[in-house]
Amino acid sequence: MTRTDIITELETDHRVIEALFTWIHRTPIEDTGRERLLQEAAGELARHAAAQERYLYPAVRSCLPGGDGFVEKENAGQERLTAMLRGLESCTVLEPGFDGRVRALEREVTQHIRHEEHDLFPTLRQGCPPETLQRLGAQVREDRARDRAVAGGSAATVRSVLAGGGAV
């Protein structure tokens, strides 16, 4: 298996989260499986945020001029996502507005992904030594390996496919 840096690890998170939203929208509106998929997406978002907080943001602060500003902007976006997820926790798929709230969350997540992949990640790749990014990627993988030992679910299937391990 090819070892990747932290940026590639976080980009893989993005693809997994996008796939989960696609599955949510392809599942019939009245199907309670949508709630399970949303819970998985929320879990993936939480793991992604934890990896950013623990590994990415310290690297941004130390490697980039103005890194604190990047991190503050990311934290503000994360607070919006957290508030939206909390608003969905008490909803069921049968409640009016559930689908609209999920789509609003997806739009916010998509904006977060675009910002990271078009602004933050290229800047970090230029400003941070490759060996640092590799080391941080290894640390993220170690954390995730522990998490996956108990997780499973659709997100694990998507990760396996992205790693070349099978088809969805």
Predicted regions and their residues:
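Small-residue-biased structural context
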Residues: 1-168
